Amino acid sequence: MTDLKITLIRSAAHRLPEQRKIVKALGLGRVDSTVVLPDNAATRGALLKIAHLISVEEINK
């Protein structure tokens, strides 16, 4: 099973409201904040909508 390490590299300020909600829902706050989430279809779908704001790495357990 793999997890995804997601880091916010660009600010969500001045972005579409939907994109800001996704950033908040993923648990990201400020720039350079990082979360580890399970690799599943729901997470991948959310990441595609904010791909220009984040950096993603796969972590093997």
Curated annotation (Swiss-Prot):
Write the protein's name: Large ribosomal subunit protein uL30
Any Pfam family from its record, for instance, is: Ribosomal_L30
Annotated InterPro entries: Ribo_uL30_ferredoxin-like_sf, Ribosomal_uL30_bac-type, Ribosomal_uL30_ferredoxin-like
Q: Which gene encodes it?
A: rpmD
Q: Which GO terms describe its cellular component?
A: large ribosomal subunit
The UniProt keywords, alphabetically, are: Ribonucleoprotein, Ribosomal protein
Record's subunit section = Part of the 50S ribosomal subunit.
Report the record's Gene Ontology biological process terms.
translation
